[in-house]
Curated annotation (Swiss-Prot):
Source domain of life: Viruses
Protein's job: May act as an apoptosis inhibitor.
Cysteine disulfide partners in this protein: none
Source lineage: Viruses, Duplodnaviria, Heunggongvirae, Peploviricota, Herviviricetes
Protein name (database record): Putative apoptosis inhibitor ORF99
Organism: Ostreid herpesvirus 1 (isolate France) (OsHV-1)
Amino acid sequence: MLSVPEMILYEDRVNSFGGWSKQLRPNKDTLAPAGFFYTGMGDKVKCFACGLEVIDWDPTDNPWTEHGKFSGDCLYLKMTGAIVKSKDATTTNPSTSNPFTGANNQQAVIPLTAPPPLFQQPPPPTTTSAPAVDVAPAPPTFGFNTTSTSKTTNYAFPARATAPPPITSVPKPMFGNGFVFNSSPNKQTALFGKPPGNGQDVCGNMPSTTNNSNKQQGVFGINMTGGTNQQQPTSGMFGVKPVVAQPFKF
């Protein structure tokens, strides 16, 4: 876990040396790459990863060497590769190249001149256009006004039923305005009401008004008056007295 994660970026550590004296050596160009940032007090610097604080710098001190001397297990040094596990891999003269002496020293610090890419400022974001992507054809519109089958979705829809043409005129009735006349002179039947005009049928005949012996039968339950051969009315729905016209002769 990092000690001061706010200083993980190299640029932030460099900017922390704003109050660092120009006469002090080493300077920000060598301290910041080694993981140190300035604390603002004297010449004390601190590692952002392990939290090591170092003071009393000499002009000949190497920040990488001093860092590894006091904090060899620093995560930043291990990740940057500044620590070499075998001191035999450094040089044939350990006394001059290896700052560590003694039988227990098994590490040598190799100074670095620049921080690794992992701890540097990330590059600014760039805008790139997305590659063209083939768009699949749109699915068919759901409805009932198509007679074809889609090849992509394999959906079939029934055709919409064709409505009959609108009625523009009504034919006239064959036997007058709502009347049907039987061929028998004694059984005329009125269906809807009075005959057209002044009581004439479609042939122009006037209805009979004489009191003959054979009275016609009313359909709607009303007896015809007069005559000697009175007939009983049939059962009907409405008490309407029909007007009887002469039969239509074919």
